[in-house]
């Protein structure tokens, strides 16, 4: 349990440091000239956040490696699931992402301005790498290979450990629009990690999930077209895709033997 808290503390601290560095980068000319720093006109702040968080996360991974908080080897050699089972798992992630988008859109939840921030990041290479690769890697190291693994080793019931980790994963996303999908997708990533005993599959799933989100930012007309549908149609299609996702996860589960999470 104490080790789980350590992972969370390091993650929160890294995000706080990254945010502070981003603010410094975005207003550097004011600090350098000794003039008053205004919070107005922070148009370059999202990109500064992306670059700062990219660098901070790289440092966090190195620190976790030095402190031996990352499993070694990171991807242990185990008998892989049949390729078609893993394809089912990845398809489940894609269907789940679309389902959650349809089911949550009618709620009109606040995202705290995150959509605008991500939209501003989409053309910066480091920001794209942060959103699609580095971010998922760090979050999987912290929440699945970190918190979830520690809870399982502490003899927590697997379901309780998976749901607790997913809830923490949702909380750190800080706004309802992101937190609800994070709770559901985080549960799926936890199931993939628990059953396979390997970070490889949940990491691939997380990267796919975030990549789909980034692609949706590049093609906003697709989302606008779906949101123009009647709410009932959105909900029906969302629930249908959700059922397909659950079915595919069940198929993967049946074809994947239980493996112990490495201590």
Where are these regions (language model features)?
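Hydrophobic alpha-helical transmembrane segments
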Residues: 5-9, 50, 86-91, 125-129, ...
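Juxtamembrane helix-loop-helix connectors linking adjacent transmembrane helices
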Residues: 31-46, 70-138, 149-154, 223, ...
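Membrane-interface helix/loop boundary segments of multi-pass membrane proteins
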Residues: 138-164, 191-198
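Functionally important transmembrane alpha-helices
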Residues: 12-16, 20-27, 178-233
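C-terminal membrane module of polytopic membrane proteins
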Residues: 40, 44, 207-263
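Active-site His/Glu-centered metal-binding helix of metallohydrolases
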Residues: 137-142, 146-147, 175, 188, ...
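Small-polar-interrupted transmembrane alpha-helices in polytopic inner-membrane proteins
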Residues: 158-173, 207
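Alpha-helical transmembrane segments in multi-pass membrane proteins
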Residues: 9-68, 85-89, 238
């Amino acid at each position: 349990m104490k080790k789980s808290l350590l992972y969370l503390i390091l993650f929160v601290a890294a995000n706080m440091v990254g945010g502070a560095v981003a603010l410094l980068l975005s207003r550097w000319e004011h600090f350098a000239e000794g003039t008053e720093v205004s919070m107005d006109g922070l148009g370059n702040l999202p990109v500064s956040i992306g670059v700062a968080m990219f660098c901070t996360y790289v440092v966090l991974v190195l620190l976790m490696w030095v402190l031996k908080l990352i499993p070694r080897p990171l991807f242990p050699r185990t008998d892989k699931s049949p390729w078609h089972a893993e394809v089912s798992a990845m398809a489940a992630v894609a269907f789940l992402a679309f389902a959650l988008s349809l089911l949550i859109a009618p709620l009109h939840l606040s995202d705290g301005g995150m959509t605008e921030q991500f939209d501003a990041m989409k053309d910066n290479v480091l920001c794209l790498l942060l959103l699609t690769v580095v971010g998922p890697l760090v979050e999987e190291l912290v929440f699945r290979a970190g918190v979830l693994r520690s809870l399982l080793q502490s003899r927590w019931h697997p379901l309780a450990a998976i749901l607790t980790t997913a809830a923490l994963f949702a909380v750190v996303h800080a706004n309802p629009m992101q937190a609800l999908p994070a709770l559901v997708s985080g549960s799926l990533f936890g199931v993939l990690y628990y059953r396979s005993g390997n970070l490889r599959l949940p990491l691939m799933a997380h990267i796919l999930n975030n990549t789909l989100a980034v692609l949706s930012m590049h093609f906003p007309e697709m989302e606008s077209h779906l949101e123009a549908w009647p709410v009932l149609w959105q909900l029906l299609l969302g629930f249908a895709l959700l059922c397909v996702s659950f079915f595919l996860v069940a198929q993967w589960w049946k074809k994947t033997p239980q493996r112990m999470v490495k201590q």
